[in-house]
Amino acid sequence: MGRRARSARSFGVSPLWGGVSVRSGDRGEAAVGGLWEVPDFWGLFPSRISPLAGEVESGTRVWLDGWRLVEEAGPGERLKASKVGRLVALAYPDAPADLLRWAADLFAWLTAFDDVHVEAPGVTTAELGPHMASFVGVLETGTAPGAAPTPFPAALAELLDRARELLTPLQEERVRARLGKVFVAMLWEITTRERTVSTAEYETMRPHTFFSAVGAALVEPCAGLDLSHGVRADPGVRRLTQALATLWERTNDLYSFAYEQRALGSVPRTLPWLIAQERGLPLDAAFAEAGRWCEEEAVLAHRLIGELSASAREGVPEYAGAVAHAIGGTRRLYEVSDRWREE
């Protein structure tokens, strides 16, 4: 972590904390001991953290404890190690305290449910389906069912109540729509454990299983903006929002690869593995290819940020700047969080 990175414009690589090395030609198994390398393009984007980071982190832990969403020791410790409050403080450094606390609690809720239920060993769509139905009911009615078997629906209803106070109606609607896609994606994720999906299918769903599409929708309100429909529909603005969500999910697949391989005892079925299967590549070459996909998206995002920063349309330059900081905080996210660290 203390090594000096090369110039971002040369697109060098920076080492992970620890990683895995893969035998040449091996697409199925990996051996612990080497380093995966992640493209270093972060110097293209600014980065800073909200001064409210510590306060928000503490508040989210209190919120989680109050709702008793995670009572098992293992998932509970991993959730605390995620440091969600500090992560949102990096993504949205200019957000006011109440909005930053809400965003942290929302991501803590999503992560807690994913850790406890979606990632549970052997979970089936039949077991997960009733949870999804209850969440959709909360999205539609704003209230939780009276006899819910877990506190998750009631906690979601509370989060949506707070959203109505903090967001404009259109911003709230966008967040609800993206949450609905998350619930579909959670069911989809269970189906991928018994089949190999295409990279196209994976890339369609991954921004929702990683919650990055939800995160991208929060950039506007967290920057204090209320963009018009015309601005939101602008192709450049839409593509930049998509690039942010894509970069978040792709870089997570790279940075978490070593941790997931170690935790699973096998190669994680994420983007590098899927590229290896689809193209017949050794896993190390497929990992490098996934890194190139990240580089290409980063270059595109950088170009769009430059173009939109010069726009005369109201709110567009400010939105471009907010996205730039959301991208730029990504590398520090993996320095701040202990969730994916090798032991």
Curated annotation (Swiss-Prot):
Q: Where is this motif: NXXXSXXXE motif?
A: 252-260
Record's keyword terms, sorted? Lyase, Magnesium, Metal-binding, Plasmid
Q: Where does Mg(2+) 2 bind?
A: E119
Residues the record lists as binding substrate: R206
Mind telling me which InterPro entries this protein's record contains? Isoprenoid_synthase_dom_sf (IPR008949)
- UniProt cross-references to Pfam families, sorted A to Z: Terpene_syn_C_2
Reactions this protein catalyses: (13E)-labda-7,13-dien-15-yl diphosphate = labda-7,13(16),14-triene + diphosphate
Which family does the entry's similarity section mention? Belongs to the terpene synthase family.
Does the keyword Ribosomal protein belong to this entry?
A: no
The cofactors it requires, by name, are: Mg(2+)
Recorded domain comment = The Asp-Asp-Xaa-Xaa-Xaa-Glu (DDXXXE) and Asn-Xaa-Xaa-Xaa-Ser-Xaa-Xaa-Xaa-Glu (NSE) motifs are important for the catalytic activity, presumably through binding to Mg(2+).
Q: Where in this protein would one find the motif DDXXXE motif, according to its record?
A: 114-119
Q: What is this protein called?
A: Labda-7,13(16),14-triene synthase
Task: Note how many cofactor molecules are bound and how.
Answer: Binds 3 Mg(2+) ions per subunit.
Function description: Involved in the biosynthesis of the labdane-type bicyclic diterpene labda-7,13(16),14-triene. Catalyzes the conversion of labda-7,13(E)-dienyl diphosphate to yield labda-7,13(16),14-triene.
